[in-house]
Amino acid sequence: MNIPTAWLQLAHKRTRLIVALSGIIFSTVIIFMQLGIRDALFESAVHLHNSLEGDAFLISPRSTSLIAMESFSERRLLQVLSFNEVELVSPIYVGYVQWKNPDTKNYWRNIFVIGIDLRYQAFKAVGIKENWQKLKIKYTTLFDQNSRREFGNITEDFQKGKTIITEVGNSGNNQKIEVVGLFELGTSFGSDGNLLMSYPNFLRIFQNRSSRFIDIGLIKFQPDIDRQSLLKKLKKYLPKDVKILSKQEFINFEKNYWATSTAIGFIFNLGVFLGLVVGIVVVYQILYTNVAEHLAEYVTLKAMGYHNRYLLWLVFQQALIIAVLGYIPGFLLGMIQYYFTQKYTLLPIEMTPTRAIFVFGLTLLMSLIAGATAINKLQYADPADIF
């Protein structure tokens, strides 16, 4: 009986109900968008980390993220081979280079370059295995087909069988390079596109770099060993001029940079908070006005013997109804926003069950907070004051 009563009170003023639902929908969409882009930022930042088939990684202690790696001596990586539990090690070189759009005259754009050792297939991504041998040719590269279109119609032209030769430049030194295949990695906030090549080709482009100084050292362990024990041994064995991380620690290292060392994480969290505030304020105004208009009826029920709990529950039911009815269209609009954001930015943004449940919980919370604030007038209302 209570639920219909709560609904009838809300539906009696349809315009007011629509305003309340609009506030919840707006807040829900804002929260979905802020959380979606924030999580896409973190996930896109670790595309490379997830694609590397290693159990541990060496980096310089001065490195802060993938976009700001500091080189260290390859000798440290080779020292790891003194442990029998280590199956192989592989150097990885990374850097940015200017890419010339072959379709647009004199249009250059920064692109992220990954140089790998072709002796070991330690990189898992679509398109790499079938093009592995092609990378042994001088001045060849694989192009990330998920790169932004500002780099040119590379994917479409290559799939049509066209030969793609363009220029890349580093420190004023331009080199012609041929795209011999496509692979899939994905863009991030730090990279609009990616190239994958052999490390000899990498060094031909980055002529100021030496093969003796690497950016990431990939370490693969022998199967069926105690990985944590070996990691502890390696940390004790290696000098302090390198840092050794497990794969999960390597992923967390990158995510922590974007979450704590940049303003991006704070900005998106602030957006979530502001979305909550907007929802609370709108729902509070609606519920407070509703309570004020029906105050005489409420105190009459009090005089008839109804407890405060009954009346408070009536208001909370209205808050819950507003939350549920507002969340459903907010969820659907969030799905639509995710679709277009992924389509036009190529960020890995998608609706997840965890996020959907979390935002629903936030929606209920904001409505209940608004309801709890709005019932103060009702809680202390005295029939003698009204009549």
For the regions a language model picked out, list residue spans one by one.
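C-terminal membrane-exit region of the final transmembrane helix in multipass inner-membrane proteins
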Residues: 2, 349, 354-387
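A short amphipathic helical element positioned immediately N-terminal to and/or at the very start
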Residues: 2-11
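Hydrophobic alpha-helical transmembrane segments of multi-pass inner-membrane transport and secretion
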Residues: 14-41, 261-299, 320-327
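Membrane-interface junction motifs in transport/secretion proteins
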Residues: 26, 37-74
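The feature marks short, hydrophobic/small-residue-biased sequence motifs that occur predominantly
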Residues: 74-78, 82-83, 87, 91-142, ...
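Basic-flanked hydrophobic alpha-helices used for secretion and membrane insertion
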Residues: 123-124, 145-245
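Peri-transmembrane interface segments
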Residues: 230-281, 289-293, 309, 313-314
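Transmembrane alpha-helical interface segments in multi-pass membrane proteins
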Residues: 275, 288, 292, 296-342, ...
